[in-house]
Amino acid sequence: MEGRGLSELFRNTSEDMFLKAMMENSMGVAAAAPSMEMMGFRNLSQGFREDSEELFNSWLMNGEIPGFSAMNNRPRQPSRLSSEAAGFPNQQHEIAQEHFPTDNLIPQNLAVHSEFTMNHNQQQLKNAAEKGMQASDLLLAKAWFHSTQPMTRSRSSELRKRYAAMQSNMPPITTETIETANKLRQDLTNASTVNSAPMSNTPSQTPTFVSPSSSSTSPLDNPHIVAQDTITSVVSMLKDTLERKKLSSHANGDTSSGISFGFYDSQHFQQNILGGTDIFPLVTTSQIQDSVMLPKVERPTEQGSGNFVAPANQVWLGTASREPSQSGSSTAIPAPSAGFEVCDDLPPIGQAMTVCESTRTNAANGNGTADCRSKGKDFRERILKENLKDDRKKGSLTRMGSISSEQADKGDPTKKRRVERSRKMAEAKERSSTPVIPSDIQVVLKRCETLEKEVRSLKLNLSFMNRKDSEQTKQIEELQKQNEDLVEEKERLLEEIERIVSDTNT
């Protein structure tokens, strides 16, 4: 609690000093803003680390819960980072090195009317003064977050789940907000000075929590822009056109028509930064001046967003697409850099290639464009040669069967039938042919065959004899019976003779 009271004391002191410096300026713009060292915050940074955990927890709750926003709870929160580029022009170098996150950026400036009164300017200056302490506290909270909770695989998956849950609760960007942004950009462009950056360069963003990419960057760096249905349809149509043009350019083998990337024409290129595969079609400024639904939004595309120091090499794109970028964007004023490095991921070969690596001197002299163009031309010629070699290899590896079958296919049908018939006869002969048997085994086999025949004949004779025997047995039995009958008749005749003889004697 002692640290909190000390924080409030220095916040009030910084408000007085900042407002005094602002009122002395005739333009009403923060042209001579006091630095962090003048207000004494540099030496007291160690004392504020005690409250960094509490500050980070409050910021985390404001970012995670959709209904519990900073605008409803803290009156100082809406101008936390929204006017940072216009409020601190003299701290440009310091802010660019510390690389403030833009997750809690609230598009309050989009609803501001074009006519700025003196009271409104004073209120904005007061909010900017109050923001100085909040930005330093947020920086300490981020440092504590990186030191105590390193990014691991499990935590990355958890943060992606939270991001997916929050993405469905984000409010869409309406037409009135875009029209108000156009009016605000025109008014601030006329009123801005050389040192101050216009607010139109600050993209209108809604608060998010975690990066949509799978890389282990900080979840405090990546903004997300909610697209409207009309914008989504236009972007999808531009993507289809881009795919058709890319296929036609690969098929016809055209040369690049005057862009620094050397692969495609002047309307599109495929961007692959930090492993992202989103396609951002380039639309010129003249094409979107008359469009209300597609205002021009300038934002830096960074190569790395994992540390506090802003990278020196940045590519500024004037695009009409409102799709979420895979890389983090910084609201700090970028360091002037003419060098850029963009990697294109070509789908036909599935490998990434560095298209251009130019220094500030080469880009200023115009040598970078020629180098990129020559590299792109050589790379496409190499791709075409590899594709031609692959086609030749595929043609040489094509087989039509065996040589004999290929020759038979080329002949007349009569010859084809003759060859087929001879092949079938040869196969039948091989199946019917018996293996060669030695002579002694052949003699034994023949002897066995003759013996089998004799045994068969003997069996027939035996059966015949048995049949004969049965007949003879029957005849014998009949004869025996007849014999018995004859014996009985003989005895009877003998008795008859004896009786007759006896009668004659008497």
Swiss-Prot record:
Q: What InterPro entries does the record tag this protein with?
A: CYCLOPS
Report where it is expressed, by tissue: Highly epressed in roots. Expressed at very low levels in leaves, stems and panicles.
For the motif Nuclear localization signal, what are the positions? 415-418
A single GO BP annotation from the record? arbuscular mycorrhizal association
Protein induction = Induced in roots 7 weeks after inoculation with the arbuscular mycorrhiza (AM) fungus Glomus intraradices.
Ranges for the region named Disordered are: 193-223, 385-434
Q: Where in or outside the cell is it found?
A: Nucleus
Its protein name is Protein CYCLOPS
- Organism of this sequence: Oryza sativa subsp. japonica (Rice)
Gene symbol here is: CYCLOPS
